[in-house]
Amino acid sequence: MASYASEVKKELTSLEVHPEHAKAELAAFLRMNGVLNLHDHQFSLDITTENPAIARRIFKLIKVAYGIEPLLIVSRKMKLKKNNQYLVRLNRDVQKILENLNIWDPAKGLVTRIPQRIMKSSEGAMSYLRGAFLAGGSVNNPETSRYHLEIYSTYEDHNEDLAKLMNEYFYLNAKMTKRRRGYIVYLKEAAKIGDFLHVVGALNAMLNFEDLRIMRDMRNSVNRLVNCDTANMKKTASASAKQVEDIQLIQKEKGIDSLPEKLQILARFRLAHPELTLKEVADQIPDGPISKSGVNHRFKKLHELAETLKE
């Protein structure tokens, strides 16, 4: 069964590739998942994934952005889960493309920060975040887990730039933390996760997420109410049991008829209706209705009398 995150990614890979924004999305893929190789003084660039839809997406992004069809190689993993592995290999104009995407600088080498032309464009930010989520993102199922969406980065400065894109353009309240082999930017608020899905274009996933979130919140509210009612019932039952115990002691030692009239009425009514709450007793007592504090005062008198009889 496909995970919730894989369903979100499936929707994102089905979106139309827009020529103006293909480079921003591709830049995220290559910066985060690309492996640069050098053979016979020639660069090649590999991106490997187990998701065929993501492999097709990368293939199409390269074709739309640069008019080049990369190689698509399918192999079978022999260790652990024997899934197919998809390798997209670019072996033409690699350095030119990496320089154009601001991933490679001839003088400085690898550039790990997100370029300013993307940092200063909301449309570019949307496309880059989409690519980043497809390359290194995950999101928990809102129905079964705690709310959590994250994107993993190898480089700290890249992680900082992702958080800046999320927060400065889309107010997502993204947080950062270090992992053993890298860094993550993450969201914990359900509403912000829904906003992120909308930003990157996963509209169906966003609507589904909101439906599941609302249902989960409703269930939690009902459970809280049930728990509260149960606690109140236990509290009522405990108080009633103590009151009945006091009255039964008075009845045994002195008799209810020995009590003042108001206490007699309350004592007999409580013995007949041990299930009622204090408010219900106050409303339904034969010489009432009276206030809860009035009923409570009478019960206190009965308790004091019962305590003297125990001595």
Curated annotation (Swiss-Prot):
Family: Belongs to the WhiA family.
This protein's record includes keyword Ribosomal protein: no
Family matches, as SUPFAM superfamilies: Homing endonucleases
InterPro entries documented for this protein: Homing_endonucl (IPR027434), Sporu_reg_WhiA_N_dom (IPR018478), Sporulation_regulator_WhiA (IPR003802), Sporulation_regulator_WhiA_C (IPR023054), WhiA_LAGLIDADG_dom (IPR039518)
GO terms of biological process kind: cell division; regulation of sporulation
DNA-binding region: 277-311
UniProt source species: Lactobacillus helveticus (strain DPC 4571)
One Pfam family cited in the UniProt record for this chain: HTH_WhiA
Any GO molecular function: DNA binding
Xref: HAMAP family: HTH_type_WhiA
Keywords for this protein: Cell cycle, Cell division, DNA-binding
Name the UniProt record assigns to this protein: Probable cell division protein WhiA
Transmembrane segments: none
Protein task: Involved in cell division and chromosome segregation.
Source superkingdom: Bacteria
